[in-house]
Amino acid sequence: MNLYRDVLRPLIFSGLRADPETVKVGLLRALEWLDATQATGILALLERLFCYRDPRLEVRLWGLTFPNPIGLAAGFDKDGLAVGVWPSLGFGFVEVGTVTPGPQPGNPKPRLFQLPQDRAALNHMGFNNQGAAALAERLRRLRQRPIPIGINLGKGKATPLEEAAADYLASFRLLRELGDYFVVNVSSPNTAGLRSLQAAEQLAPILATLQGENRGQKPLLVKIAPDLDWPEIDAILELAQAYRLAGLVATNTTLRRDNLKTRFLPGLGPLAAAAGGISGAPLRQRSTQVIRYIHQATQGQLPIIGVGGIFTLADAMEKLEAGASLLQVYTGWVYEGPSLVPRLLRGLAAARNPAPSSPERMPTGIQSGRKIVMDP
């Protein structure tokens, strides 16, 4: 029996009738306490339970060493409250944020909903965060950095779209010495107009501004939506080449509501009319399609962080085989619990030696047991 999946999750999702955001905040506060107190006995127990180390899983990318290819996606630990604890839960990297130049409360509550019938979540958070300065201060206090830390950058809600570049630049300047890689988030559906910044004519000045400041010192990526069509992705790939992006994160949440079993949300009404993005299992297939398209269109030359609907080893393998170099989990981790990461890693390590007759089935990130090296 899986204690989390069979006992704790049903209580959290239904038995306690708890607001999902309240539960998440409570977990983050507990992990923040662990980080602050460095309760070594508890941290050691977490490491024994959830860390799986195997040098065959190491990924070297952008001059960074990732102990394994499974990371925590942006949005869970926006303010880096537990950034020192995620390594003890087995993650190979963590992406904090989305962060904006100044603090902002986000959209009105309730704004996070679990959809258990669909193994999914609906969120309409709106970049709630304490601001770049607060995150910078927290990252400066880190005692050690055993895994790479990515920082996801966003535009403030009150900032006009035509001034978006200034917002991304302001946060980058505050945080550039503290992040190992940076992600430009122009794909969240929860800030009015933000997704329009994925259009080439809108995205180009943002990338020009950031890369002009960056001068190639930090890996810069863009996170894209799953709802883009192929010509729109092609335009972003042209910008990726023109502005020497280090990679893409594929994908953010989706606005699509088709094929969902959930129809109504208590206190909110019809799901079809609810604002926000869907994450989890319904996103798996489309995010993998986008990963495969990018990988093929760039002949495997543009690294991809694959995210969306990873619940099982098969899900993870699918994205690696499609062309992802690294993976991120969020909703799957909420549903499956902390045992998900070591379970995935054990499976990936076992999969590194396939039958000689089927080398094409090897995950891209661990082909033939070799470590990936993709430094520009």
UniProtKB/Swiss-Prot annotation:
The keyword Metal-binding does not apply. It is found in: Cell membrane. Catalyzes the conversion of dihydroorotate to orotate with quinone as electron acceptor. Monomer. GO terms for molecular function: dihydroorotate dehydrogenase (quinone) activity. FMN binds at residues 74-78, 98, 152, 185, 223, 251, 280, 309, 330-331. Residues 352-376 are annotated as: Disordered. Its main location: membrane. Binds 1 FMN per subunit. Pathway: Pyrimidine metabolism; UMP biosynthesis via de novo pathway; orotate from (S)-dihydroorotate (quinone route): step 1/1. One of its GO terms (cellular component) is cytoplasm. Its EC number is 1.3.5.2. SUPFAM superfamilies: FMN-linked oxidoreductases. This is Dihydroorotate dehydrogenase (quinone). It catalyses: (S)-dihydroorotate + a quinone = orotate + a quinol. Its cofactor is FMN. The lineage of its organism: Bacteria, Bacillati, Cyanobacteriota, Cyanophyceae, Synechococcales. Keywords: Cell membrane, Flavoprotein, FMN, Membrane, Oxidoreductase, Pyrimidine biosynthesis. NCBIfam families: PRK05286.2-4, PRK05286.2-5, pyrD_sub2. It is a peripheral membrane protein. Substrate binds at residues 78, 123-127, 185, 190, 252-253.
